[in-house]
């Protein structure tokens, strides 16, 4: 069973939701804008979670699925190699742990308080829209092992002033730095 794309999108008054054990997949933007939802438990049956699930949802997340790990407001895949969603919208700086190899699609989308970010050498790919609309992001240190930067990866990072693309990068997606107005 699937919770479809945008299934509960902008259900501003939704206060509680129990995901049944029959659900195996949760679609893109399923809980966008569910501002009143206090907590959410991902059941053990869930094996697939799409990108950008939690935009404008700041409740408590508990993950019972063996396929995912929730640690300090960060949702990882089961081996913590991919960041699926970063839910700490109030943090101003973040150092991605050195066991992460991939930043998922829209994982940090609109983390508007994030000002500085360190991406360690373990990271080799940055997903589509991974840091899109992180308007306060000014400082970015990128891994020397990154090979791909996805479409719209840094789109709308309007405070980003400088950025060094390492020689290891072989692919930069469409609109990767679109609307980065402060970029020199």
Predicted regions and their residues:
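Structural signature of tandem-repeat unit edges
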Residues: 1-2, 11-25, 35-48, 57-74, ...
